[in-house]
Design a protein with these regions (language model features):
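N-terminal leader/linker segments that initiate helical-solenoid repeat arrays
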Residues: 2-7, 17, 21-106
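Terminal, low-structured helical/coil segments at or just beyond the last alpha-helical repeat
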Residues: 88, 194, 198-225
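Alpha-helical linker/edge segments of TPR/alpha-solenoid repeat scaffolds
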Residues: 82, 98-105, 160, 191-194, ...
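Residue-level signature for tetratricopeptide repeat
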Residues: 76-79, 114, 148, 182, ...
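TPR-repeat structural position
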Residues: 83-86, 121, 155, 189
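Register position in tetratricopeptide repeats
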Residues: 117, 151, 185-186, 218-222
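Alpha-helical adaptor scaffolds
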Residues: 102-174
Length: 225
């Protein structure tokens, strides 16, 4: 009786610590006398209890920045072998290029683009002048003004704006294409070909760039004969 009472006391004591009942002690060891102190403590260890808190969920990764999105799109554009995919990537790049990160900047850009679309070049130019003062680091503001200045027959001013675009975003194939157009128009075929080729490296499936490179390559070869 003394031995049984002692085992019963141990079972109750362990149950108070970790939920181990006398019946569990019997199941673990087969008989009360077969349950070692180490085994009882191991079963009752709070570290191994089902009551331990669940592991903390991993935090969500931060959303990609605008620059990271552009880097990804340009990498995919350079690797693309499908003209249809190229068109989609270019459209996505154009949308990101039109995002300034500022409501005011986006508003002015939208008005400038609308004025450009309706051939109201003076209004578009004035809006872009203001936008460049507000956000001089926005490559697309300079690019749009380069377009407006070209349409206003200000090729020197357009080239100056294109140079600024390419400092801010060297992968701007639209600016490189515009540079090629101006150089070709001025009779600088070699320089124009270099600009077109650089643009084609960035967007190798863009048909208009391929046509320009092929045309000028033939022209330059003809001049050297």
């Amino acid at each position: 009786m003394i031995g049984f009472a002692r085992i019963f006391f141990i079972g109750v004591f362990v149950a108070g610590l970790g939920g181990l009942s006398l019946a569990a002690a019997y199941r673990v060891g087969g008989t009360p006398g077969a349950v070692s102190a180490e085994r009882i403590v191991s079963v009752a260890d709070p570290a191994e209890s089902d009551d331990s808190p669940p592991p903390k969920a991993k935090p969500e990764p931060p959303a990609p920045t605008r620059q990271q999105k552009l880097d990804d799109l340009f990498a995919r554009l350079a690797a693309s072998t499908d003209p249809a995919e190229t068109d989609g990537l270019i459209a996505a790049i154009d949308r990101l290029n039109l995002e300034s990160g500022s409501d005011t900047g986006d508003f002015l850009m939208a008005r400038a683009v609308a004025a450009l679309g309706s051939q109201n070049l003076q209004v578009s130019r004035a809006l872009l002048d203001k936008l460049i003062i507000l956000q001089p680091g926005w490559a697309e503001a300079w690019n749009k003004r380069a377009t407006v200045r070209y349409l206003m027959d200000d090729e020197r001013g357009s080239m100056a704006d294109i140079a600024r675009v390419l400092i801010l975003e060297p992968r701007h194939f639209g600016a490189l294409s515009g540079m090629g157009m101006i150089l070709e128009r001025g009779g600088f075929s070699d320089d124009a070909l270099r600009a077109y080729r650089r643009a084609l490296e960035i967007a190798p499936q863009l048909a208009s760039l391929r046509a320009a490179v092929d045309r000028l390559t033939a022209a330059v070869k003809g001049q050297s004969l």
